[in-house]
């Protein structure tokens, strides 16, 4: 009986130590669920609690992953009212993750007061859909995955569609110490995101926008910057104001280079293009996903 008692005491003591450890290290705004199972390749559904709200995301780890080699991380955000799963199927970067060897995440936006999933790109702006902290949520995703997987912390990228495109500009402004480059499709900047931008380092930016986009107008509208405004803002911030234009069948490509000839900002103006992440329409023989990856993957936090 005595030894059974001591065994129980040892187990309780061990549980206490483990509980204390996690309380000490994770007792902040975010509670991360740690799985005791070995990470499997392919798709998995993840969740965490940030700011008292349970948040979820889809993780895709390519078959090429092994713990001995660092891989880049790409985070891809859905549009307003959509879901991570739907967006993953419509803007599917999984084949690219396999061929180009990167880890892929599709986060799920929280519901606004009217019940629609959304993203808040500016934590202090008045044009957000709610007061939910999406910048902090993304930061926790990055930090937790860097702890779990062998991710190259200098090669973290973000891409987004529509409202998800709004968010990636907010991330570039707020997390330029973590995110090296971003890509937007049919998205833009809120006026408040631009006014409150606090980027502390250059960030590569690629923007794909259709001239017939009536949801997020190419020429802007009240509270939303035009495609030209967005491009000019980031070319100024990145000190890459030397413009090169190439006209193609159905789209024009604008590159903005620094004095060394490095392109920090690229804009695809899709003639008569609508409000869509359309990988069925090929721009110069490449999909939107390919165009974004080929651009952002050139960058790391050193430039």
Language model region names:
Residues 21-73, 85-91, 99, 130, ...:
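A domain-start/cap signature at the N-terminus of enzymes
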Residues 75-79, 186, 209-210, 271:
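The conserved beta1-alpha1 loop
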Residues 108-133:
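Cap/lid segment of the alpha/beta-hydrolase catalytic domain
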Residues 12-20:
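Sec-dependent N-terminal signal peptides
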Residues 126-149, 170:
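Alpha/beta-hydrolase active-site loop
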Residues 214-226:
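Conserved alpha/beta-hydrolase "acid-adjacent" motif
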Residues 204-208, 224-226, 237-303:
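C-terminal catalytic histidine-bearing segment of alpha/beta-hydrolase fold enzymes
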Residues 65-115, 191-192, 215-217, 276-277:
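Short substrate-entry loop that stabilizes the transition state in hydrolases
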């Amino acid at each position: 009986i005595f030894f059974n008692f001591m065994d129980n005491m040892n187990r309780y003591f061990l549980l206490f130590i483990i509980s204390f450890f996690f309380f000490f290290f994770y007792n902040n705004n975010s509670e991360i669920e740690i799985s005791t199972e070995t990470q499997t390749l392919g798709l998995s559904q993840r969740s965490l609690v940030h700011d008292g709200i349970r948040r979820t995301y889809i993780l895709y780890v390519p078959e090429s992953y092994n713990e001995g080699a660092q891989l880049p991380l790409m985070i891809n955000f859905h549009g307003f009212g959509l879901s991570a799963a739907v967006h993953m199927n419509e803007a599917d970067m999984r084949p690219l993750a396999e061929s180009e060897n990167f880890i892929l995440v599709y986060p799920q936006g929280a519901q606004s007061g009217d019940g629609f999933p959304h993203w808040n790109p500016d934590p202090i702006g008045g044009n957000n859909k709610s007061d939910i902290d999406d910048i902090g949520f993304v930061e926790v995703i990055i930090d937790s995955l860097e702890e779990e997987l062998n991710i190259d912390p200098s090669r973290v990228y973000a891409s987004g569609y529509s409202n998800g495109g709004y968010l990636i500009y907010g991330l570039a402004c707020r997390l330029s110490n973590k995110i090296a480059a971003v890509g937007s499709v049919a998205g833009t900047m809120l006026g408040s995101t631009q006014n409150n931008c606090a980027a502390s380092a250059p960030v590569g930016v690629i923007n794909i926008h259709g001239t017939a986009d009536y949801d997020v107008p190419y020429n802007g509208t009240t509270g939303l910057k035009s495609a030209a405004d967005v491009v000019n803002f980031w070319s100024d911030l990145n000190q890459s104001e030397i413009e090169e234009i190439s006209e193609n069948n159905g789209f024009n490509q604008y590159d903005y280079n620094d004095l060394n000839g490095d392109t920090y900002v690229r804009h695809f103006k899709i003639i008569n293009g609508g409000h869509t992440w359309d990988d069925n329409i090929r721009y110069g023989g490449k999909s939107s996903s390919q165009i974004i990856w080929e651009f952002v993957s050139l960058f790391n936090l050193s430039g």
